[in-house]
UniProtKB/Swiss-Prot annotation:
Gene from which this protein is expressed: CAD
Residues that, per the record, bind Zn(2+) 1: 47, 69-70, 163
Top EC category: oxidoreductase
Gene Ontology MF term list: cinnamyl-alcohol dehydrogenase activity; coniferyl-alcohol dehydrogenase activity; zinc ion binding
EC number of the protein: 1.1.1.195
Gene3D superfamilies: Medium-chain alcohol dehydrogenases, catalytic domain (3.90.180.10), NAD(P)-binding Rossmann-like Domain (3.40.50.720)
Protein's name in the database: Probable cinnamyl alcohol dehydrogenase
Binding, Zn(2+) 2: 100, 103, 106, 114
Pfam family membership, one: ADH_zinc_N
Length: 356
């Protein structure tokens, strides 16, 4: 990042072990360089993948760990080589804060697929300092991994878009599914799923929410604007929906069967996996062969796609549905999130919280 300019300390809420319990933690931020922004965190969303990380579900966690990758903040200081941002700008950043800048993904605006990417927490930056996330008073981020939040989008509403929003937007664009008239399915109505309904509807798609029970029917149809609701245990309903969907977003973050949902896809339909699962998923090959169907995955989106998604949401008047909390409620919120007891994203009011 060039010559080092300044090192600062901040206080965040960190997990110390796989219990996942967060508590105040004061630490040094990495040194800021000429391409960096020093940012005061305003709001930070809570994603289900944060639970996987703080509880070491994937076997790769290092402690102390400050989670949070759906971050919106205010620029307090810019490095000498920063050109896109000024002090006072409201900006967002996500789960990737570094890349090699020379590989094929990096050179094609797909830096989230760089094999040398640096995660915004539970990783190590190029200077050897551990990266820490957005459940903290301040962060340091390179300008390449920051986007400006459009006027008209409130900070707490914008935060979940940095992950949940672009996780849906990116594959719709990349897989040629942006045109109106398509029929899409949303499997799982959580943080990503509810944005899937909103964004797909705004693109002119017919949207079916697929859930394990009937309890979210009214929310899906009347509040989020879905066109249809399908209960996966309803054999007749599932049979009637066979070969009806162009794509399905599978947002479920736990092990589940794939075959019932593959049956819902049309010829050349896509099952797009976006949920982080730490165990194998299974299916029999004829389920994809006989319909030339695809099981694929997608990981967040590039910074370019994030900018496009934010403008799309502003243009269409889309916001995330959230429950705003203070930091001292975060452990309760994480427990509720594990039980799917949130509509549909917790967002921490970091700037309004007592952190120490």
């Amino acid at each position: 990042m060039g010559s080092l300019e300044k090192e600062r300390t901040t206080t965040g809420w960190a997990a110390r072990d796989p219990s996942g319990v967060l508590s105040p933690y004061t630490y040094s931020l990495r040194n800021t360089g000429p391409e960096d922004l020093y940012i005061k965190v305003l709001s930070c969303g809570i994603c289900h993948s944060d639970i996987h990380q703080i509880k070491n579900d994937l076997g790769m966690s290092h402690y102390p760990m400050v989670p949070g990758h759906e971050v919106v903040g205010e620029v307090l200081e810019v490095g000498s080589e920063v050109t896109k941002y000024r002090v006072g700008d409201r900006v967002g950043t996500g789960i990737v804060v570094g890349c090699c800048r020379s590989c094929s993904p990096c050179n094609s605006d797909q830096e989230q697929y760089c094999n040398k990417k640096i995660w915004n927490y539970n990783d190590v930056y190029t200077d050897g300092k551990p990266t820490q996330g957005g459940f903290a008073g301040e962060i340091v981020v390179g300008e390449r991994f920051v986007v400006k939040i459009p006027d008209g989008l409130e900070s707490e509403q914008a935060a979940p878009l940095m992950c949940a929003g672009v996780t849906v937007y990116s594959p719709l664009v990349r897989f040629g599914l942006k045109q109106s008239g398509l029929r899409g399915g949303i499997l799982g109505l959580g943080g990503v799923g509810h944005m899937g309904v909103k964004i797909a509807k705004a693109m002119g798609h017919h949207v079916t929410v697929i859930s394990s029970s009937d309890k979210k029917r009214t929310e899906a149809l009347e509040h989020l604007g879905a066109d249809a609701y399908l209960v996966s245990s309803d054999e007749n309903g599932m049979k009637e929906a066979t070969d009806s969907l162009d794509y399905i977003f599978d947002t479920i973050p736990v092990v589940h069967p794939l075959e019932p949902y593959l049956a819902l896809l049309k010829l050349d339909g896509k099952l797009i996996l976006t949920g982080v699962i730490n165990a194998p998923l299974q299916f029999i090959s004829p389920m994809v062969m006989l319909g030339r169907k695809s099981i694929t995955g997608s990981f967040i989106g590039s910074m370019k796609e994030t900018e496009e998604m934010l403008e799309f949401c502003k243009e269409k008047g889309l916001t995330s549905q959230i429950e705003v909390i203070k930091m001292d409620y975060v452990n309760t919120a994480l427990e509720r999130l594990e039980k799917n007891d949130v509509r549909y994203r917790f967002v921490v009011d970091v700037v309004g919280s007592k952190l120490d």
